[in-house]
Amino acid sequence: MQYMKSLAHPDEFLSLLKIGYTESFKPKSQLKENLGNKEWCYELLNKTSRSFAFVINELEPSLKDAICIFYLVLRGLDTIEDDTTVELNTKLPVLTSFSEGLYQPGYKVFGYGMNNDEKNLVENFDKVVDVFLGLGDGYCTIIHDITRRMANGMSEFLQKSVVTLPEWDLYCHYVAGLVGIGLSKIFHASGLESEWFATADDESNQMGLFLQKTNIIRDYLEDINEKRIFWPRDVWARYTLHLENFKEAKYQIPALHCLNDLITNALSHALIALDYMSRLKNPQVINFCAIPQVMAIGTLNACYNNYNVFTGVVKIRKGQRALIVDAIQSKGLTATYELFFKFANEMRHKVPPNDPSAKKTIQHLESIEKLCIEKLGYRPSGFNDFISYDWMAVTSLAVSSAFLIARHGPNFFSKL
């Protein structure tokens, strides 16, 4: 269905083909047997998070292993935090001691995981530990420190809810801002980025907050159905007595006002994120950082003033995601600024004049547009500016590809 939607956007369709979109149709396979520990880690990464695996595998070899292990370690920690079947008094000591297990050969955890992939990770965590211990002291120190701090933060918020905006910032710092801080230190330790990244904790934190707040906003329905609340009470309580009310159509207007309020808050991190990315030098690191950030502002644009957030799943089209990846891989920071401008500009034109947050929302969006124009030296116009295509050829390719997929199935291109 996703490729059919993209037929109306030939630029997206070509990008889908270029980045090998047919992988998304392949079922998740079982892990291969008799793998070395490092190979096992990469197999699990590819199986559990194809999008993250995609950007990791594009990195320099000196950086790739460290970030793969960093991801799996934090995924293991998250598996313990998220398992709602385990009593809190049982879970907390496992969380807070998890980082020490990184220095214990053979360390693994049983009794956690909401699905087979999560169970596979923590029950075979000794394989991750083995590769971790071979990374070198610099990387190990960073990963251990971030894991310890994140575990303590998770433990804190397992015992209380998010009420105020400062608490929302703190929660997002623990679960995502610390990831940004760790990544910056890893970038510097690899020698691929400057010393500035070793101490850029605030900027790195805001990169993480921008991503995490976007996820929390988008995932309203999934979280509320699981009896989880990550929207800060001080915000939603201005619009309703009970957060779950927003699922009912009669509360649509206050629901949208609350949604737009939180999106406006998330947008406050965008300028710092753009400044952070402007300091990156390595092309693969730029791609690694820029793709998720552009996806985030694209997702905020899709969610803004959209009541579907409260009734279903809102996300940018698969073809549009492919176009973002293709554009950034082709043009790096130039495409990043262009895309940020486009999404900010589109969102600004959707702001309802009577929305309570309208003035602040427009201020944030105009600031993003202004900075992007300054960085580029020109004002972008349309998505099709990113990559020059022969549109007759693209349309012909799209139609031909759709025919082949309809005739031979979605994995046709992966067989070529």
Curated annotation (Swiss-Prot):
A single GO BP: farnesyl diphosphate metabolic process
One GO CC term on file: endoplasmic reticulum membrane
Record keyword Disulfide bond present: no
CDD domains per the UniProt record, alphabetical: Trans_IPPS_HH
Keywords, alphabetical: Cholesterol biosynthesis, Cholesterol metabolism, Endoplasmic reticulum, Isoprene biosynthesis, Lipid biosynthesis, Lipid metabolism, Magnesium, Membrane, Multifunctional enzyme, NADP, Steroid biosynthesis, Steroid metabolism, Sterol biosynthesis, Sterol metabolism, Transferase, Transmembrane, Transmembrane helix
Cofactors named for this entry: Mg(2+)
A single GO molecular function term of this UniProt record: squalene synthase [NAD(P)H] activity
Catalyzed reaction equations: 2 (2E,6E)-farnesyl diphosphate + NADPH + H(+) = squalene + 2 diphosphate + NADP(+); 2 (2E,6E)-farnesyl diphosphate + NADH + H(+) = squalene + 2 diphosphate + NAD(+)
Subcellular location: Endoplasmic reticulum membrane
A matching Pfam family: SQS_PSY
Source taxon at top rank: Eukaryota
This enzyme's EC code(s): 2.5.1.21
Enzyme class: transferase
Keyword DNA-binding (UniProt): no
Record's bilayer topology term: Multi-pass membrane protein
Transmembrane regions: 285-304, 386-406
Pathway membership, UniProt: Terpene metabolism; lanosterol biosynthesis; lanosterol from farnesyl diphosphate: step 1/3
NCBIfam families from the UniProt entry: squal_synth
Family in the record: Belongs to the phytoene/squalene synthase family.
The name this protein goes by in its record: Squalene synthase
